[in-house]
């Protein structure tokens, strides 16, 4: 019998992030507590989002609104990294980045976790920015998925190509 396998990746659907950003922008434009604060949210480059407002409290509230929209669109909070508010003239600015991909240190940490705590006979190989996990038994692969979901890793993981 052939080995079963799946890939562990960290990818974010940019269209879903764009939808969350547009929903947040619409809410910021219509909500009563944001009236007159010149609160904006926009893309700055491919993976950077910038939020601006007239006060520090309003920009923090705008970040919370955006995070709420991300969660509603099934995007993990581990994929969005927001900085502290920075004064910028008469406004405050927060830049946040969308994190994608598994770094080599994170990949080593994940494969070590699978080797140490996962079922016997499970192999994990690093392939670029993804990890291929293979085993003879599908039940072992499901146990590895449960292990990784329960682990406190600082990266949003998705499981794809389950065969």
From Swiss-Prot:
* GO molecular function terms noted in the UniProt entry: nucleotide binding
InterPro entries from the UniProt entry: DUF520, UPF0234-like_C, UPF0234_N, YajQ-like_sf
Q: Which CDD domains match?
A: YajQ_like
Q: Does the keyword Nucleotide-binding apply?
A: yes
Per the record, what is one GO cellular component?
cytosol
Q: Which UniProt keywords apply?
A: Nucleotide-binding
Pfam families attached to this UniProt entry: DUF520
The family classification in the record reads: Belongs to the YajQ family.
This molecule's function is given as: Nucleotide-binding protein.
NCBIfam families assigned? PRK05412.1
Q: This protein is called what?
A: Nucleotide-binding protein MSMEG_1165
């Amino acid at each position: 019998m052939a080995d079963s396998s799946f890939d562990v990746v960290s990818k974010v659907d940019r269209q879903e992030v764009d939808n969350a950003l547009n929903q947040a922008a619409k809410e910021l434009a219509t909500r009563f507590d944001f009236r007159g604060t010149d609160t904006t949210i926009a893309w700055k480059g491919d993976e950077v989002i910038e939020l601006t407002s007239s006060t520090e409290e309003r920009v923090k509230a705008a970040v919370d609104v955006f995070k709420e929209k991300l969660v509603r669109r099934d995007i993990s909070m581990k994929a969005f990294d927001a900085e502290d508010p920075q004064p910028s003239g008469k406004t405050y600015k927060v830049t946040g980045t969308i994190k994608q991909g598994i770094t080599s240190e994170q990949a080593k940490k994940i494969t070590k976790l699978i080797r140490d705590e996962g079922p016997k006979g499970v192999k994990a190989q690093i392939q670029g920015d993804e990890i291929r996990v293979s085993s003879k038994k599908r039940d072992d692969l499901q146990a590895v998925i449960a292990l990784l979901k329960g682990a406190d890793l600082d990266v949003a993981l998705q499981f794809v190509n389950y065969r």
